[in-house]
Regions:
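Ribosome-associated RNA-binding proteins
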Residues: 2-169
């Protein structure tokens, strides 16, 4: 202890770690979600949104959910059974489309209910099934740490899962 300060070694909580900083632009950052793990993609997109960027996520039906197919289906079906005894409108909203499911995952990683900055960040988000014409010409990015590492047979595509729980294209 020198001069009233505690000297701590640089560790996990220090600010010396390398973090990717993306500069705010007028054009949206387009993320191609093909073969990305859902949670890792959502956390990376949430960070970009909180930095003040506009983000568009394309190909939401090709996002991968980790875990066995049967477990993913079972968890989604159990979630669909949650509702209110008195009135079904009082229960949670059950999204079945891949783009709205992904938008909800990202929203849950933002301070949506606690801070106005979270709501503003969520308004800068756009999610799409496929790739719309106006976005096809823009450069698309991918997050290396969010890509799947094993073969695709170890994951379930979000589009496939949504078709099973009731999404009709």
């Amino acid at each position: 202890m020198a001069n009233g300060r505690i000297n701590r070694p640089a560790g996990r909580n220090s600010n010396t770690s390398k973090q990717e900083v993306v500069v705010r632009t007028d054009r949206p950052i387009v993320v191609d979600a093909t073969n990305h793990i859902a949670g890792r993609l959502a956390s990376n997109v949430a960070k970009l949104l909180m930095q003040g960027n506009r983000v568009s996520v394309v190909n939401c039906e090709k996002i991968m959910m980790s875990g066995t197919r049967s477990n993913q289906i079972k968890e989604q079906r159990e979630f669909l059974e949650i509702n209110s005894i008195i009135n079904y409108k009082h229960g949670p909203v059950h999204y079945r489309r891949p783009d709205t499911l992904m938008a909800k995952m990202i929203r849950q990683m933002l301070p949506f209910d606690r801070k106005p900055s979270g709501k503003e960040a969520h308004q800068r988000l756009r999610t799409y099934i496929g790739s719309p014409k106006e976005i096809k010409s823009l450069e698309k990015i991918q997050f290396e740490k969010a890509l799947i590492r094993k073969t695709a047979s170890n994951y379930t595509a979000l589009g496939e899962l949504c078709r099973i729980i009731g999404w009709t294209e």
